[in-house]
């Protein structure tokens, strides 16, 4: 099979990925064991895409010989009739061998070719990273099939490990290898997994292995375990061989199948988005998510489980009325213990440790404390010693903790979680006692603190709080007269001084003058009117003074800003001006000045203000 792999990995032709098309019915499968995933048209149902490109430019013209060996295993069933790829999106005469005619022959039980024969369908993608040659992988059912109807990798049998090659992977995964890199390398030199009828050997130190690219959705949408499996396949695992028990495969089945091995739905909101369908609340959403993980057989780390337990019991510890628990969404004791069992079973050699840096954490295990309810959690020991895998370096895992320490932590956690009701009652009692002690300590600056001061025997503090009884100081509170005449101060030793007798002059008793009116300005002299006009701008009195000045024959010049008074009749009177002798008031000297033959234009004379009659 490695020879076939090397001959199909050319680089001259780079054909883009397209829609898968199966070969004609003449490429039917040969005789062999029954396989429920082997379609009668020659399609191998399973993964949708293993690689996006098919390079066939440098394929050799013929295979080596009729008795060619596949990974040092002779296979008499390798036939060499003439033929070519006549269907699909490409045609090439460089490979004259019909790949579907590479029947098993005498190679039953040897290389990784399924018992139904090597059936290549569509535009298969044989990348340099899919090596299914040599070794044996027992542990997965013999009815395993090949890969999808678009791309197929010979020698890799897919049973329930990949969803029993059902449409759940085919429809929802789309193009597993078209984008990024879901897994890097899984290289093994003779990794032996007993129980697989379709043998799988990962080539040693080849830097290849199962290289599935693309950041796509696994198992019918964005399942929570998709990223876990990506992390499981995330790094290189160079091993020297060793048995991989059935429990390891079964744990992966539990992760990937999610209790629906034959479900063909493209979208399941309960599995794809568990937080949308879980109950509300700070602890409820996480509890619903853990419930979905428990249903899928997927565990959570111990640290996360402990955090969920604390959040579940103490949602809002700062509230004084908190009594613990949740009346709307109670979580029974059996459910908590069962969630914890799933968490602990995920952290040991029975399951793969879903860490961030990848790697199989196959350490020694122990039996579950509830074997009658979860018998699948028991596993065998010695997995890590046989495989020689490096431990997981993720902070969420406990690979760096020894076996004895892990057992002690688990037993300690079990002893604490056996009595959650007693713990809640003790917590409530502690809170009640703490609240009582807090209430008993009175604030010294409130009324209760003042009462404590009043009860003391210190007279100075009592006088500061209550004051002094003035009757003890000689103050007659029943007197009808003024008290200031007889009492000066409580802290003085001298008697109160007598009141001094004095008389107030009559001028201080003058009545308030009446307010000014328009009639009042008629009694004012010229000087007082001019003073009122210039000293009270923007005031009502200024308008009254100006009105009275107009009444007495004065007018205001807007350009010179002075008051003029006519002396006699004007000498010349025209339509726009007049000329004669005038007197005006100089505001600087506050005196009247005479001007003869002075011309005054009418447009420069201010009109008389119109005032309301008061």
From Swiss-Prot:
GO terms for cellular component: CCR4-NOT core complex; nucleus. Residues 1-46, 58-89, 361-391 are annotated as: Disordered. It is found in: Nucleus. GO terms for molecular function: mRNA binding. The keyword Transcription applies. InterPro entries: CCR4-NOT_su2/3/5_C_sf, Not2/3/5, NOT2/3/5_C. It comes from the Eukaryota. Residues 364-381 have a biased composition (Polar residues). The keyword Magnesium does not apply. It holds the Pfam family NOT2_3_5_C. Keywords: Crown gall tumor, Nucleus, Transcription, Transcription regulation. Transmembrane segments: none annotated. One of its GO terms (biological process) is DNA integration. Disruption phenotype: Impaired stable genetic transformation by Agrobacterium T-DNA. Transcriptional regulator required for Agrobacterium-mediated stable genetic transformation by T-DNA integration in host genome, but not for T-DNA transient expression. Belongs to the CNOT2/3/5 family. Interacts with Agrobacterium tumefaciens VirE2. Binds to VIP1. Forms a complex made of Agrobacterium VirE2, VIP1, VIP2 and single-stranded DNA (ssDNA). This is Probable NOT transcription complex subunit VIP2. The gene is VIP2.
């Amino acid at each position: 099979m490695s020879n076939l792999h090397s001959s199909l990995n050319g680089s001259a032709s780079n054909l883009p990925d397209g829609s898968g098309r199966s070969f004609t019915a003449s490429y039917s499968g040969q005789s062999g064991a029954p396989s429920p995933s082997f379609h009668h048209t020659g399609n191998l149902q399973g993964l949708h895409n293993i690689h996006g490109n098919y390079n066939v430019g440098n394929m050799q013209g013929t295979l080596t010989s009729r008795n060619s060996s596949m990974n040092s295993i002779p296979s008499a069933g390798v036939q060499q009739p003439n033929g070519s790829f006549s269907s699909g999106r490409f045609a090439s005469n460089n490979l004259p061998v019909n790949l579907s005619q590479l029947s098993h022959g005498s190679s039953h039980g040897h290389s990784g070719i399924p018992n139904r024969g090597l059936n290549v369908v569509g535009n298969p993608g044989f990348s340099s990273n899919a090596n299914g040659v040599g070794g044996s992988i027992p542990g997965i059912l013999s009815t395993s099939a090949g890969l999808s109807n678009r791309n197929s990798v010979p020698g890799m049998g897919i049973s329930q490990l990949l969803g029993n090659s059902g449409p759940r992977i085919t429809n929802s995964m789309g193009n597993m290898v078209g984008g990024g890199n879901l897994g890097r390398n899984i290289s093994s030199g003779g990794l032996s997994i007993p129980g697989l009828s379709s043998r799988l050997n990962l080539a040693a130190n080849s830097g290849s292995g199962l290289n599935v690219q693309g950041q796509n959705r696994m198992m019918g949408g964005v399942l929570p375990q998709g990223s876990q499996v990506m992390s499981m396949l995330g790094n290189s695992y160079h091993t020297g061989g060793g048995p991989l028990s059935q429990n390891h495969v079964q744990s992966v089945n539990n992760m990937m199948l999610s209790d629906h091995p034959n479900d063909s739905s493209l979208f399941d909101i309960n599995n794809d988005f568990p937080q949308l369908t879980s109950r509300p609340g700070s602890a409820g959403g996480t509890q619903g998510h853990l419930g979905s993980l428990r249903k899928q057989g997927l565990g959570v780390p111990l640290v996360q489980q402990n955090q969920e337990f604390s959040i579940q019991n103490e949602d809002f510890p700062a509230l004084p009325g908190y009594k613990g628990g949740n009346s709307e969404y109670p979580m029974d004791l059996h459910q908590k213990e069962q969630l914890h069992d799933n968490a602990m079973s995920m952290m040991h050699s029975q399951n793969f440790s879903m860490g961030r840096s990848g790697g199989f954490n196959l350490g020694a295990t122990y039996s579950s404390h509830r074997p009658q309810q979860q018998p699948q959690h028991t596993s065998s020991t010695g997995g890590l010693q046989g495989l020689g895998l490096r431990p997981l370096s993720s902070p969420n895992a406990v690979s760096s903790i020894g076996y004895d320490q892990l057992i002690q932590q688990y037993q300690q956690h079990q002893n604490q979680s056996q009595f959650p009701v007693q713990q809640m009652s003790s917590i409530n009692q502690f809170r009640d006692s703490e609240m009582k002690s807090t209430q008993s300590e009175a604030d010294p600056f409130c009324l209760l603190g003042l009462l404590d001061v009043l009860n003391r025997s210190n007279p100075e503090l009592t006088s500061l709080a209550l004051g002094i009884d003035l009757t003890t100081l000689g103050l007659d509170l029943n007197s009808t007269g003024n008290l200031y005449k007889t009492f000066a101060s409580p802290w003085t030793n001298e008697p109160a001084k007598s009141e001094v007798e004095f008389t107030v002059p009559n001028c201080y008793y003058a009545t308030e003058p009446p307010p000014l009116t328009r009639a009042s300005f008629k009694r004012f002299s010229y000087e007082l009117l001019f003073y009122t006009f210039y000293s009270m701008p923007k005031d009502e009195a200024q308008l009254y003074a100006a009105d009275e000045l107009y009444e007495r024959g004065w007018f205001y010049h807007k350009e010179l800003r002075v008051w003029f008074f006519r002396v006699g009749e004007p000498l010349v009177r025209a339509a726009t001006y007049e000329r004669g002798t005038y007197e005006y008031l100089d505001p600087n000297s506050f005196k009247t000045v005479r001007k003869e033959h002075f011309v005054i234009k009418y447009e420069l004379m201010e009109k008389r203000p119109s005032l309301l009659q008061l």
